[in-house]
Amino acid sequence: MDSLTLILITVFVILILYWILQGRNSKSPPGPVNLPIVGYIPFMTSKPYLDFDKLAKVYGPVFSLKLGSHYAVIFNDFYSTKEAFAQDAFIGRPPESPFELNKETIETEAFNGLPWIEQRRFSLQMFRDLGFGRPRMEELIKEEIMDLLEHLEKTEEKPTEVRSVLASSTSNNIAILIFGYRLSYDDPRRKLLDYCIRESARQAGQVTWQIFFPWLAKILNFFNLGGTSTLSKVNKTFRNYVDKEIQQHEKTLNEADIRDYIDGYLLEIRKRHDPAFCKPVLADMVGTFFGAGSETVRLTLEWLLLTMAAYPDVQKQVQTEIDEVISRERLPTWKDHLQMPYTEAVIMELMRWKTIIPINILR
């Protein structure tokens, strides 16, 4: 081997070692060795939550690794996660996201830090004022349940696919809070919203990996590849729908009669004169509520139905408790759950066993 070849090999090895070790210092949590460019991703399976669990057994509940271009710290137990999320330092979100936000949301950092705390505080108070968790909201939810039951009765006990009707029903509960109305399942607007929510979740899942390779994402976007264009079209369709709703609410806004979340937010814009409270941010907030409050509930209900079918003994005990506490002469109320420990335990165990979001959103 000549000296030039030896020098090149030595330099190459040094560069590789430097690349592997960069980003990790004495204050960083322990973690596995990362490869250049791709980090630890090549060693991960299709179930990253299980991969993280295995790494936690080696490096402890808090460890670090590189995911593509990003250095990440993983919290893999309840106590460290709770401690971290209690700190304002973990409120922020990474700048890369599969979902497009309005430039006003990005510029004012409305979804990060202190501005986000204000958005969250206002939203929680607004939902309380609208009756969230109170008898008024219960009555609206009961109306939706009755419509869902009537729809299912039409199947005449024949095998049926429930995903679409559950999606419409759970989304309607969000629509009542946000828009002030619900939509029948065959309403074209209902079908449009269902399409946007369903496709947005599906397309986002396909392009999420690009978050870890922002340089590659820019190249793919430049050549209109990678699926982001489809997601962008879906997001634009949903945003157009929401923008029309906001415009309609502005025309009929009455300070003495706050009908829904959009009404409340529009009035808050007038009061605050805060750039983080504006109509583009409102549109993004609406998208967040539909995205987080529709698919998650729908998926939980699907698992619940499947589990009840798979475990008829459990289903029978749940039905017995329902009959004893509620009977079949009326619809349930929220306070009934205080007398239904078995049913509540079944739901809680299902959410633990079939976790629908095993890895939390990046922070």
Language-model region placement:
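Conserved cytochrome P450 K-helix E-x-x-R motif and the immediately C-terminal K′/meander segment
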Residues: 41-60, 240, 331-363
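Terminal signal-anchor or tail-anchor transmembrane helices
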Residues: 1-27, 172-173
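Cytochrome P450 fold signature focused on the C-terminal beta-domain
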Residues: 34, 249-262, 316-340, 353-363
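Hydrophobic mid-domain F-helix/FG-region of cytochrome P450s
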Residues: 18, 70-82, 145-150, 160-185, ...
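Cytochrome P450 substrate-recognition site 1
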Residues: 25-44, 50-140, 161-162, 166-173, ...
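Transmembrane helix-loop-helix
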Residues: 135-156
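Conserved cytochrome P450 catalytic core segment spanning the I/J/K helices
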Residues: 128-135, 157, 208, 230-301, ...
